[in-house]
Structures are given as structure tokens and as C-alpha cells.
Amino acid sequence: MGAKKNFVIDTNVILHDYNCLKNFQENDIYLPIVVLEELDKFKKGNEQINFNAREFLRELDLDTDDNLFNKGASLGEGLGSLFVIAGSVDAPDVFDSFPERIPDHKILAVVDWLTRQKKDMKTILVTKDVNLRMKARSIGLLCEDYINDKVINVDIFEKSNEVFEGIDPALIDRIYSSREGLDISEFDFKDIIHPNECFILKSDRNSVLARYNPFTHSICRVNKTKNYGIEPRNAEQSFAFEVLTDPNIKLVALTGKAGTGKTLLALAAALSQMNDYKQILLARPIVALSNKDIGFLPGDAKEKVAPYMQPLFDNLNVIKRQFASNSTEVKRLEDMQKSEQLVIEALAFIRGRSLSETYCIIDEAQNLTPHEIKTIITRAGEGTKMVFTGDIQQIDQPYLDSQSNGLVYMIDRMKDQNLFAHVNLLKGERSQLSELASNLM
């Protein structure tokens, strides 16, 4: 352990992780009173940040006493103390640089004041607000991002699928002829092979799409299969269908840029297994353009979120167009929607539900925090499969990035579990124009 430090916590850290106070080891934590005032504004509502605000304030009330405002309250064994700085503090350097008395500047004032009061200890502002960190550095204050749930190396989650060359062609022939596959011990892989990892095996005369099955410890052939009218256009999409349709894999992550077919593949795979589940649920978080509240939009709650759900309906329409308008397949889809066997809605509307015997697809999962994804997964009951899709480089939430979003966090934590599979889709299949824009712009 290094020298003890003082950390001043910004509101957005608490809204990101209401358990954050437990993650600063033996260091002391300071909360400017303005942080509690800001949390009070977030208490009402059904979004995850509203829950986080309520839960943090509830636990703060249960775990502390009057010492919180003077001597400080202990956070528990092995942890430091928590202090609330009430009232204004003397911080002329801050208000000379930033005269406007907004919450951010009041937080900076506490950091500056504490830095001067506790000269024998480092005082560090912890905030997920990039702009506030820039302001802090501009006046010589120490600051950092909240990194407890950050994934350091995200490049490994964006690589193309492995191609193993120099494989004995006889082994590949045997994979083609064997339904169960070959024991992994017959292969001399130099790299670590994760459970359910998909790859291409090549020799000088043949090749095969394959997957490591952790339940049988075997390398199995991946077939190119059509699912509810959708045929895979490349190896990556074949890999996706492989893990999306395996009943032993309960949790799947599909990543990739726009146009790679993530959501379409997941929905088609779900529909091909409709008889195995009571319901197919397709949802996505609502992230308003420029982070404006959707409350100003006309209509009731369902009507307000309808524009944000349209991309999901677009994927369903793509599948419908694979069949004649009067076909049995299209009629079945329409009946499923009417009976709510197929449901497409905003993620907020399913919060708190227990999901049993459900094929659940969460789109745009890169816009969720690690805690939000954990909350969703823990709702899974018996017979449920959960699929999360997203592009970890296209994040619309202001306090998330490619290292701290819930999707990449889940992949990092689950990558060695037998029930989990991750496929990264690189090749765009929407159109030549879409592929060009994704690569160059």
C-alpha cells in the first residue's frame, strides 16, 4: 500500500457505481455537500442512475452518523473514513479562474481547499467528467477517472477471429467427418483458447471453421446454417449463428461496427428457436440525441420511445422481407407480436422483471454501465439465454468510454466461463457505402 490519500468524489461517479465508496481501500473520501444536493435531483425516476442515487443515499443514511460532518464516519474494516464538506470553503484560485458558482466549480473549490488544508497528503478529484478533469488540471489540482471497473486492454476484444495455419490436413478431414469433433489435445495451439472461441483452421490443402466446445473439450466444425431466412455472409456471421443457437451457451456478446449484422443475426437466431422459449425479448437503452431528456417529446411513454426503438423494428422487417407477405413465416411473426411472444421495447420498461425461458437480446449494450449489465444478467431465470450486442467504440453516454462501458466489462469478466461466448464481427454487410463510411469516417 502507498501513502494514504484524500479523494473527493464527483456526483457522476456515484451515479455510475453506487458502491464506489468501498473501492478506495484505506484512503479517506470527501463528499462536497453539493454532491448530495445533486443526487437529490436524481432520486425520482426508473432509470439505473435514479436507482443508484436512491441506493447510495439510503446506504449513506444507514451506515453513518452525525460524525459524518465533523470527525468523519468509518467506512469499515480496511477502509478509510468518509467526510461531508458542508457550506462554502475558501478557494480564491478556483473562483478567480471560474467565477460562476455552479456545482462543478464548488467541487473544485473543495479539492483546492482540502489540498491546502492537508499538505502532507495527496488530494485527488475523482470524476468521470472529462471537462471537469481538464479544469482541475488547468489550476494545478490532481484528478483522475474512476477506474475500478475499467478494462485496460480492449484491443483483444476487437481483433479478427484467429486463423491457425499449418494444421495437419488429416486433422481437418477428421473434423469434417466427425459429428463430435476432435479432442483439443490433438492440436498444438500456441495461444490460449477460450471457451466457445471460434476460429479458422488451415492447412496447405484444406480449411475448416471451428469452435472449441468446453463441455466436451473438443474442436468442432462450425456449419454455415440459415436461420429464419437469414444466411451468414462470412465466417464471422457463421460463428455468430453457432454460439447464438447453442443451448448450452447462456450468455453471448456480439461486438462490431455498424452494418456487421449484430442485431439481425441475434434476432434471426432467436426466431429459429422460438419453440424453445416462451418469449423473445428485444430491448435497447434509450440514449437521447445530444443527451437531451425525451420528456419534451409528445405522447405517452411508449410513443416517446418509439423513435429509438425503430432500428429494432427495421431488423424485424428485414427478416419479414425474406418471405412472401402472405407466407406462414410472416403470419407467425405477426401472431407472435400480438400475443407478446415477441416483444420489442425500451430497456427501462423491463427493469425489475424476472426473465424465465426467455431469449433476451439487449441492443446497444455499450451504452450501459457495468452495474446495469450485471443487474440485467442477474434477472435471468431458468431456461433464459441473454445476448448483448454493441460497438464498444460508438458510445453515446457522456461518462462511459471504450474501457469503462458495461459490454467490454462483461466480456472481460466472462471470457473464461463455459456458459459464455464472444464473437467480434469486422466485415460490414449492410452495403458498400455503409462499409466505406464505417472504415473512413
Predicted segments with their positions:
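Active-site-proximal, substrate-binding regions of enzyme catalytic domains
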Residues: 3-124, 130-227
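Conserved coupling/interface region of RecA-like P-loop/ASCE motor cores
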Residues: 41-74, 310-312, 408-441
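Pre-Walker A (Motif I) flank of P-loop NTPase domains
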Residues: 247-253, 357
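Hydrophobic anchor at the beta1->P-loop junction of P-loop NTPases
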Residues: 254-256, 266
